[in-house]
Structures are given as C-alpha cells and as structure tokens.
Swiss-Prot record:
Gene3D superfamilies: P-loop containing nucleotide triphosphate hydrolases. This is Energy-coupling factor transporter ATP-binding protein EcfA2. Belongs to the ABC transporter superfamily. Energy-coupling factor EcfA family. Forms a stable energy-coupling factor (ECF) transporter complex composed of 2 membrane-embedded substrate-binding proteins (S component), 2 ATP-binding proteins (A component) and 2 transmembrane proteins (T component). It is a peripheral membrane protein. GO terms for molecular function: ATP binding; ATP hydrolysis activity; ATPase-coupled transmembrane transporter activity. The gene is ecfA2. Its main location: membrane.
Length: 285
C-alpha cells in the first residue's frame, strides 16, 4: 500500500479578483520521495504550494496531511507550518534578520523551544547546509546561492516532514544547481524529508526526482515517474515545456539517425548504457 504524506482532493482556489487558479486538483504526494511540479508561468504551482502550507485556504475541496484534513485554526496552522516548510524562489523575500544565525534560529525561537535545543537545531541546520562559517555574517552580505542555503536552513531548524521549494535552482550557476540539488536529495535520504519542488529546469528532473506532476491552467494533466511523463512528448511540448536535453538527443538519434531504442533515456548514464548496448548488438550481428 502506498504511503502518502499529502493528499489533495478536488482542490479549487479562487482569488478575490475572480481568478480561478486551481481547478479540481487531485494529487497524492508520496512520503520520503522527491516530487517535481512542472508547468509554465501562471499555471497555479505557487498557489498550490501556498495551499499546502496553509497560507491560502481552498475555496473547495480539501488537503490531507498525514491522513488528517488540515486544521485551519490558528493553532492548527502554526503546527502545520512546523511540519511543512516553504522556501521561496527569491530568498530575499524570506530573510529579514541581521545575521545568518539570527535568521536561521527564528523558526525554532517561534516554537518556544528551550535555548539549548535552539542552539543544537541551528548548529545542525547550519552544518547540514554547509554554511557554518557564515553564521555571524550579515544576511545582506551573502551571495544569492548562500542566501538560498540560509533560507533552507531556516526551515530545517523546525525539523519539517515536508520541504517545499519554489524554483530552488533559479539564479544559480551550473555548479550551484548541482550543489543545491545534491543537498536536497541528501536531506531526503538521510532525514526522510519529503521534498516537493516547482522548477523550469527540466534537466534536473530525471536526475533527482522520483515523481512528476505536470500542470496546465490550474489542472494536473500528467503524472508519473520521469520516464512515464516525458514519454508523452507531444503533451509536454503543448504546455510550453520541453524534454530533458539527453531525452531530446535520444529522440533525434531514433527518429533521424536510425537508432533503435525501446525507451527514451533521459540522463547521460541511461543514454550511455543504451548506446553501448545498441553498439554491441550491431557489432555482434
């Protein structure tokens, strides 16, 4: 039996200006895995995330966290936000304390934890995100990538079960993208945290994500593992997305260069294995 940490049932959300942002969303998020939400700008990804965290309340439908409907009382929402943390696309919207240590400690202080527990959690979060050496530095002096790590540490200090990240790789150089995604997968594997990301960086999805949902105009139109989702090439392109670069290369090799592949590989490792197998078969024949 599948273990889902979040269940979304017929979720609708309307903004006060009449915009129908989410339209009958049904979605199950598997516990302890990395899930990507894909879609163009304005399809409702950020609205969905804010519903997950209780920042917004559904117009209709419901969200279950740990098999219980979200409690929208003040106490219930405070408890929910300890368990489901959000890291926004722009960390400057999330960092407001004078120093890194103060900013990271904010959530733990708000939980009214004992001082020694706060220190322990902050030290662990700083170490986990690789920013121990920055703890006394003013937040406004940090690079964009360092600010991202501080924002993640500020959520980690509350020891959440779910970590939601809106465009975690936006604004980062290629090395920064790799480092931040490896950090997230490390947290998922070692701490058991469920990771949910929204991203336009298609190439990271087959490398780091277990599950994928594709949204269009407030609806989920595709879901599955990366291979299942990107196999629907025409649907992907119709919603202004693309295949991962390796997947596109394999598509060209198959359709234009006579290579015979059973599946569309999406990563360098998968492609090398398939091409070597194809090459050996040709030479042996």
């Amino acid at each position: 039996m599948e273990d889902y940490i979040l269940k979304v049932e017929e979720l609708n959300y309307n903004y006060s200006d009449g915009t129908h942002a989410l339209k009958g969303i049904n979605m199950n998020i598997k516990r302890g895995e990395v899930t990507a939400i894909l879609g163009g700008n304005g399809v409702g990804k950020s609205t969905l995330f804010q519903n997950f965290n209780g920042i917004l309340k559904p117009s209709s439908g419901r969200i279950l966290f740990d098999n219980k409907p979200i409690d929208y009382s003040r106490k219930g929402i405070m408890k929910l936000r300890e368990s489901i943390g959000i890291v926004f696309q722009d960390p400057d919207n999330q960092l407001f304390s004078a120093s890194v240590y103060q900013d990271v400690s904010f959530g733990a202080v708000n939980m009214k934890l004992p001082e020694d527990e706060i220190r322990k959690r902050v030290d662990n979060a700083l170490k986990r995100t690789g920013i121990e050496h920055l703890k006394n530095k003013p937040t406004h002096c940090l690079s964009f990538g360092q600010k991202k790590r501080v924002a993640i540490a500020g959520v980690l200090v509350m020891e959440p079960k779910v970590l939601i990240l809106d465009e975690p790789t936006a604004g980062l150089d290629p090395m920064g993208v790799s480092e931040i995604m490896k950090l997230l997968v490390e947290m998922q594997k070692e701490l058991g945290i469920t990771i949910i990301i929204a991203t336009h960086d298609i190439d990271i999805v087959p490398l780091y994500c277990d599950n994928v949902f594709v949204m269009k105009e407030g609806r989920v139109i595709l879901q599955g593992n990366p291979k299942e989702v990107f196999a629907e090439k025409e649907v992907i392109r119709k919603v202004n997305l693309r295949l991962p670069r390796i997947g596109h290369l394999m598509e060209i090799l198959k359709e234009k260069d006579g290579f015979v592949f059973d599946e569309l590989d999406l990563t360098i490792g998968q492609a090398r294995k398939t091409i070597n197998s194809w090459k050996n078969k040709i030479f042996n024949d």
